[in-house]
């Protein structure tokens, strides 16, 4: 499995469409929580590296859930810090608070119209 930031195969469910068997199974759920991978949206952890393929992927996931009548709930951080930020010291680095704020704002802007619950671990 290729888990590069611009590849969508490394995900909870590999193909999202109304015909997908897993998507149909979600119809029995009222809510579904999934993680948005910071490295997928911003591979180097900054707005400058915003990855359109990553945005498209999560829009597809969210739209498929909504089409199935399932309320999406997204976790913004679930232990997947971009490697470049880990290399700069990880969370103890004071710059990370501002970078996470930028990432969270992008998520709210891009997905907040459809995802009403965004959390972090």
Predicted regions and their residues:
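Substrate-binding cleft and catalytic face of glycoside hydrolase catalytic domains
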Residues: 2-5, 22-121
């Amino acid at each position: 499995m290729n888990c590069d930031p611009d590849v969508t195969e490394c995900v909870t469910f590999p193909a999202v469409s109304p015909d997908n068997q897993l998507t149909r199974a979600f119809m029995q759920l009222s809510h579904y929580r999934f993680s948005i991978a910071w490295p997928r949206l911003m591979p180097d952890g900054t707005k400058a590296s915003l990855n359109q393929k990553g945005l498209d992927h999560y829009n597809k996931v969210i739209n498929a859930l909504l089409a199935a009548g399932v309320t999406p709930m997204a976790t913004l951080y679930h232990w997947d810090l971009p490697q470049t930020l880990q290399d700069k010291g990880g969370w103890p680095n004071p710059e990370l608070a501002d970078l996470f704020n930028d990432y969270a704002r992008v998520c709210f802007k891009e997905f907040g119209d459809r995802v009403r619950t965004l959390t972090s671990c």
